[in-house]
Amino acid sequence: TLGDVGAAIQAVVEDAGYSVIRELVGHGVGFAPHEEPHVPNFGRRGQGAELEEGLVIAIEPMVNVGRRHIRTLADGWTVVTADGSLSAHFEHTVAVTPEGPRILTRRSGDRGSKEE
């Protein structure tokens, strides 16, 4: 489920001593680059939509060194951490296939790639 994905991200991030932004999430990918479903970077296992064959999602954890809270600057676009801590954004696009998840954005030489 999407809850399984979010719970796994949250566990890895928080176990490392960081926090996950909750207001910004990943998304489905299809004819438009940003589609349903929303893919939160936190959650509870077993909850949320099922990951069905053919689904393509962008998993986009935004990880803060400090607390998880954010704020938007006066320009209405720029988002910063509320406590001024550093933050990083990661992204992979994943397809749900009959054989399991396939990371579409993995490059040769990336950790966990078949070439490794």
Task: Describe each PLM feature range.
Residues 1-116:
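Active-site neighborhoods and metal-handling regions in enzymes and metal-associated proteins
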